[in-house]
A protein has these predicted regions:
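Conserved helicase motor "Helicase C" RecA-like lobe of SF1/SF2 P-loop NTPases
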Residues: 1-41
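Conserved beta-strand segments of the P-loop GTPase G domain that flank and frequently precede/overlap
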Residues: 40, 66-67, 86-88, 121-123
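Conserved helicase ATPase core of P-loop NTP-dependent helicases/translocases
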Residues: 24, 28, 33-68
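A short beta-strand element within the Helicase C-terminal
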Residues: 76-89, 118-121
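Short, solvent-exposed loop/turn segments at secondary-structure junctions
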Residues: 1-6, 44-46, 70-72, 90-92, ...
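Residue-level signal for beta-strand positions within conserved beta-sheet cores that form or flank
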Residues: 33-35, 73, 113-115
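A conserved SF2-helicase RecA2
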Residues: 91-100, 104-135
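Alpha-helical scaffold elements adjacent to nucleotide-binding pockets in ATP/GTP-utilizing enzyme cores
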Residues: 22-26, 51-55, 76, 80, ...
């Protein structure tokens, strides 16, 4: 992911200031309160990440947006997650497993109650990402 992002001339901060803000704007337009949406990159210390994780697990933060590098290994926020949305296709299969692992794990109240949890992949028809998801 990081290599691909650098090849495109971007970094997590650029994503945060562009794509992530647009996603938040659209969510707010659909009625999601802004304080229930957070960006993983805004939590830069162990203490702030702990607070973030507690807020996601309690439901105070309903939507957490971030990259694989910011939300990968060690992120335990599965308690109330109902869906995982992929807006790109990572180059490494283990990154897909890591992303889906945020939601598909023991301790998820939805999964443990037998409710469906969902994983979505968004792609542009005919794009390279579409090809990657089909491999």
């Amino acid at each position: 992911y990081e290599e691909r992002l650098k090849a495109l001339g971007g970094d997590d901060d650029e994503l945060a200031n562009g794509v992530y803000q647009e996603i938040k704007k659209q969510l707010v337009a659909q009625g999601v309160p802004p304080h229930e949406i957070a960006f993983a990159h805004d939590f830069n210390t162990d203490a702030s990440r702990k607070v973030r994780n507690e807020k996601v697990n309690s439901g105070d933060i309903r939507i957490l947006i971030g990259s694989t590098s910011k939300m990968g290994a060690g992120l335990n926020v599965q308690t109330r997650l109902a869906a995982c949305h992929h807006v790109d296709c990572p180059w490494r299969p283990r990154d897909i497993e890591q992303r889906n692992g945020r939601i598909e794990r023991q301790g998820n109240l939805h999964k443990d109650a037998g409710k469906n949890i969902r994983v979505f992949q968004y792609v542009t028809e005919g794009s390279f990402d579409a090809l990657m998801w089909h491999q």
